[in-house]
């Protein structure tokens, strides 16, 4: 559960309505893999991830980034039940993929940076504060199965 004021929920929803999930999802996942290269080990089956350029142009990375942000967007519809919304993904990432739950926090941080880059002045400190709460809540929900 994420405790947002009505104004914060409106800010999050309004901005998300403008997000190009395909573009920003690919950018967010690509940035995660470039900035935190140890995360690449979970995506070795995606092909060449040996350089930043290879990551940034890898079709499988871009497609998976879109998938990730699509799921994130679904979570925004259920802010009062994030653990339930992400229960299956939490189980998958814990039991099958063995992803370090810290990576969820890192991806959330990268997503905030990508949103700021794309929305500039529209991504005010208040909007950032609301998104920081949301990405922390989503990361916590995805890590839930680990506890």
UniProtKB/Swiss-Prot annotation:
Ligand binding (heme b): 64, 93
Tissue expression profile of the protein: Red blood cells.
Organism listed in the record: Elephas maximus (Indian elephant)
Manganese as UniProt keyword: no
UniProt-recorded name of the protein: Hemoglobin subunit delta
Oligomeric and partner information: Heterotetramer of two delta chains and two alpha chains.
PROSITE patterns: GLOBIN (PS01033)
Domain Globin: 3-147
UniProt KW keywords: Heme, Iron, Metal-binding, Oxygen transport, Transport
Domain of life: Eukaryota
Gene3D superfamilies the record matches: Globins (1.10.490.10)
GO CC terms, sorted: blood microparticle; haptoglobin-hemoglobin complex; hemoglobin complex
Flavoprotein as UniProt keyword: no
GO biological process: hydrogen peroxide catabolic process
Protein family (similarity comment): Belongs to the globin family.
An example molecular function term from Gene Ontology annotations: organic acid binding
Family annotation (CDD domains): Hb-beta-like
Cleaved signal peptide residues: none
């Amino acid at each position: 559960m994420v405790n947002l004021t009505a104004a914060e929920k409106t800010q999050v929803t309004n901005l998300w309505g403008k997000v190009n999930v395909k573009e920003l999802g690919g950018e967010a996942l690509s940035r995660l893999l470039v900035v935190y290269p140890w995360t690449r080990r979970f995506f070795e089956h995606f092909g060449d991830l040996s350089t930043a350029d290879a990551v940034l142009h890898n079709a499988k990375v871009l497609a998976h980034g879109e998938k990730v942000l699509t799921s994130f967007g679904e979570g925004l519809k259920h802010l009062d039940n994030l653990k339930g919304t992400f229960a299956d993904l939490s189980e998958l990432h814990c039991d099958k993929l063995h992803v370090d739950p810290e990576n969820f926090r890192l991806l959330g941080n990268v997503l905030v940076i990508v949103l700021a880059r794309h929305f500039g002045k529209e991504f005010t400190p208040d909007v950032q504060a609301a998104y920081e709460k949301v990405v922390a809540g989503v990361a916590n929900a995805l890590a839930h199965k680990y506890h």
